[in-house]
C-alpha cells in the first residue's frame, strides 16, 4: 500500500529543518519510496556531464537535489503558525 504524505506535486512548501532551512519553493516531484521530495530552487546539486556532440567541452549541469519529507511544511500552515505566534501575548 502506498504511503500518504502531507505534500504533493505543485504544493508551495517551506524547509523547516536541515541545511536548507528557511528556503521555500514548489514541489516538483515526490519520491515516495525514499520519503523525499524535489523542491524548485532548493538543495541544488552539480552534475558533471562528459563530452558529447551536444556538449563538445563537457559541462556542469545544476539540478535540484531531494529533501526529506519530514523537513517540509506547507507554506499556508507555516504562515498560519507564524501569525499565531505573533498574535500571542508575551508572558511576563
Curated annotation (Swiss-Prot):
GO molecular function ontology, one term from the record: structural constituent of ribosome
Stretch forming the signal peptide: none
GO biological process per UniProt: translation
Assigned GO CC terms: ribonucleoprotein complex; ribosome
The keyword rRNA-binding belongs to this UniProt entry's keyword annotation: yes
SUPFAM superfamilies assigned: Translation proteins SH3-like domain
Pfam families in the record: KOW, ribosomal_L24
Coiled coil feature spans: none
Family named by the database record: Belongs to the universal ribosomal protein uL24 family.
Function in brief: One of two assembly initiator proteins, it binds directly to the 5'-end of the 23S rRNA, where it nucleates assembly of the 50S subunit. One of the proteins that surrounds the polypeptide exit tunnel on the outside of the subunit.
Quaternary structure and partners: Part of the 50S ribosomal subunit.
NCBIfam families: rplX_bact (TIGR01079)
Name of protein: Large ribosomal subunit protein uL24
Organism: Opitutus terrae (strain DSM 11246 / JCM 15787 / PB90-1)
